[in-house]
């Protein structure tokens, strides 16, 4: 509804023993068992079979780097949606450092002709569209373990997202995000900001 996600059910299933340590999977069997318990409980209550999912990830292996990039306006000096798309597509082709995978690429701002900063450049006039992107990286092994844990219980991972960003999206207003309000998510083994 209106592009918003509506939570219809939830289930908590703790990972037993040393299956997870500080947000990282150490024992795939224990984590898979916990995922299966939660998914089966929800499936039974809702009368559905869950076969695919988006999964959240956190841990000490997560880091971010800033990467500037720019493109030139495609037509007549007006920035169009296709220019923004081209800028984003160019960033998707940036290779991850060895041993890491890109989890998310987030534009921090847009700048038109090295002068005007804007949240939405579409419809502005200029020849050059630039942005600084925040690239969220995670350790390949940690990411692969999460994907393996899902696949072991016949769940296709549709994508991964950073837990800290999901928490912020869930509780902060656009104004609070613009003002730089931080969300501190204190968990059993990790604290995400």
Question: What kind of feature is each model-predicted range?
Answer:
Residues 1-183:
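Nucleotide/phosphate-binding catalytic cleft detector across ATP-hydrolyzing
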């Amino acid at each position: 509804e209106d592009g918003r996600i509506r939570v219809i059910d939830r289930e908590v299933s703790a990972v037993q023993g040393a299956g997870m340590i500080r947000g990282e999977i150490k024992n795939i069997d224990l984590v898979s068992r916990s995922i299966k318990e939660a998914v089966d409980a929800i499936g039974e209550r809702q009368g559905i079979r869950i076969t695919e999912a988006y999964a959240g990830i956190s841990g000490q292996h997560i880091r971010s780097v800033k990467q500037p990039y720019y493109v030139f306006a495609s037509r007549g000096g007006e920035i169009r949606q296709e220019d923004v798309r081209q800028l984003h597509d160019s960033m998707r082709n940036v290779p991850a450092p060895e041993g890491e995978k890109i989890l998310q690429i987030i534009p921090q701002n847009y700048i038109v002709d090295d002068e005007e900063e804007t949240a939405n450049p579409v419809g502005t006039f200029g020849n050059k569209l630039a942005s600084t992107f925040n690239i969220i990286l995670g350790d390949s092994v940690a990411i692969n373990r999460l994907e393996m844990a899902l696949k072991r219980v016949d769940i296709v991972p549709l994508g991964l997202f950073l837990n800290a960003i999901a928490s912020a999206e869930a509780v902060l207003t656009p104004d609070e995000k613009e003002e730089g309000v931080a969300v501190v998510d204190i968990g059993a083994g990790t604290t995400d900001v």
